[in-house]
Amino acid sequence: MGYWEWEEMRDAFGFTMEQFIYFGGFPGLAPYINDEDRWRKMMEDSIISPILNHDILDIEEIRNPPLLRQVFELGSIYSAQEISLTKMQGVVNSGTVPTISSYLRILDETMLIKPLQKYDNSAIKTKNSIPKLQAYNNAFRNSYCQHTFEEALMNKTEWGRQVESAVGAYLAGRAILDGFELLFWRDEKKNECDYVLKKGERLIAIEVKSGHADNIDGYHAFMKKFEKNIVNSFIVGPEGLPLEDFFRLNIPSLFRTSLK
């Protein structure tokens, strides 16, 4: 599935950056963003339901379609957050952990929800880590969001989550197009780096801050621990790389040349 990027939505529909972050990159739904109830209904009727109820079922054998939808909804709601498969099983109250894992794989292959693994030098630890779920388009997240666009803008904590999820959505799509792995990092002290891009042994560290970059200990801890492999690192936000510049980055070039 192809999603429109920031500059395309801006040029075609006059989207502001804030509108792109919240409503995502579905050109067919752009005319409805000023009527959010209608926009959400259109998201469900013209995007989500056709994909889950028809497109995926045409190409995959899904024994429990309601569970597939529940996993998708959880992935959307928890976009840019960690959640264990065991916890997901408890929330949906059905299915097995292997089934949920297989449905996440299908949602990843169809560019809906990506389960990010935690970066580790050990491939086994990476594979067995608690995933950080990432919607491929922030429109999925906000189809289920309890905050309207204006409410999200006014809520500092919520808007921070919106921005992080939008950045992750862009990176998830570029990972497929540009051929790199998208991961995250957290250590036993709960130091965290929001996104880690990996190509071969080369790493790029990205931290997302929608406001003041005042809590970036995890970002620095990651760079210190994996200094030999990091070829680029930067903060996305008002005190780092502006969102307008981030969304037009040539990411493959960052594995070759420092952004600094």
Map each language-model feature to its residues.
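Short, hydrophobic beta-strand segments that form beta-sheet elements in well-ordered domains
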Residues: 231-237
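Conserved small helical "lid"/interfacial subdomain of P-loop NTPases
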Residues: 3-16
